[in-house]
Design a protein with these regions (language model features):
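Nucleic-acid-processing active sites and adjacent nucleic-acid-binding tracks
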Residues: 86-128
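Short, glycine/acidic-enriched loop or turn micro-motifs at the edges of active sites
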Residues: 74-77, 102, 132
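Gly/Thr-rich phosphate-binding beta-strand-loop-beta motif of the actin/hexokinase/Hsp70
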Residues: 62-89, 213
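Extended C-terminal subregions enriched in glycine
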Residues: 124-138
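ATPase catalytic-site recognition across NTP-hydrolyzing enzymes
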Residues: 10-72
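Signature of the SF2 helicase/ATPase Hel1-core->accessory helical subdomain module
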Residues: 1-10
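C-terminal nuclease/phosphodiesterase catalytic domains that cleave nucleic-acid phosphodiester bonds
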Residues: 35, 39-44, 78, 85, ...
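Flexible loop/turn segments at secondary-structure boundaries
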Residues: 10-11, 48-49, 77-79, 93-94, ...
Length: 232
């Protein structure tokens, strides 16, 4: 069985540009959704039953927040994405996602983008996984934020020692019921949306940056409040 993909991720080229251009492919992918495009053009059907997250909670209008947080998972390798999520903690200790930075850009660019994200969202508490280059990233982002006149953020780089895969799996129900995304999050952050909605419970996942950071949200709120989340 030969699998011929319309788009080659490694070379960033199309199988046959005259039949389907790269621009047209990405337009179709955005319109029909990554899962359908993947099945139609990449011969990679997504296993719907095998998805880790079977549902996502959404919100239309922002609540009142008792605190604005940021959770950042820096890229471990060149193939990884930096995933930085700003979320508001509601009075009943739910999380509403306000802003997402999800990129493969090099650290020298993302440090500035991260600092802007912290400043623009008036974040109170920044938690950054300090594994690999996270500690230096945290230091530089904090310096840039202060240079730009915002001093309201407390930076907390910390070492994440728990197993990533088991953290993601064991917290999936908490994520489904306690993390709320904007109703238009598919349009706002298409790559992040794709990473969350196609992540498989078992089998090979190329990347886990998005689920890792979202798992960090529920861990952060649980540790900060010592509250028991409702698991359905």
């Amino acid at each position: 069985h030969i699998s011929m993909k319309a788009y080659n991720e490694e070379t960033d080229t199309m199988l046959c540009e005259s039949v389907l251009s790269k621009e047209e492919y990405f337009r179709k992918k955005k319109t029909m959704g990554a899962d359908i495009a993947s099945a139609n053009y990449q011969q990679e059907p997504i296993d719907l039953k095998g998805r880790l997250y079977q549902k996502f909670s959404t919100y239309e209008t922002r609540s009142n927040y008792i605190k604005i947080w940021n959770y950042t998972d820096t890229a471990d390798t060149g193939a990884d994405n930096l995933c930085s999520i700003v979320f508001g903690e509601t009075e009943d200790h739910k999380a509403e996602v306000l802003d997402v930075l999800f990129t493969k850009e090099p650290m020298e660019k993302t440090e500035t983008a991260h600092a802007e994200q912290i400043k623009n969202n008036q974040v109170n508490h920044v938690r950054i996984e300090s594994n690999s280059g996270g500690r230096g990233f945290s230091r530089n982002s904090e310096r840039i934020v202060k240079e730009r006149g915002y001093r309201g953020a407390y930076y907390e780089p910390f070492h994440q020692s728990a197993n990533k895969q088991s953290r993601i799996l064991s917290n999936s129900a908490l994520v489904e019921n306690n993390v709320y995304f904007p109703s238009d999050w598919k349009i706002r952050w298409p790559e992040f949306y794709e990473a969350m909605t196609t992540y498989q419970r078992e089998g090979k996942n190329k990347h886990d940056d998005a689920p890792d950071a979202v798992t960090g949200i529920v861990e952060t709120l649980a540790n900060d409040n010592q509250v028991r989340f409702i698991q359905y």
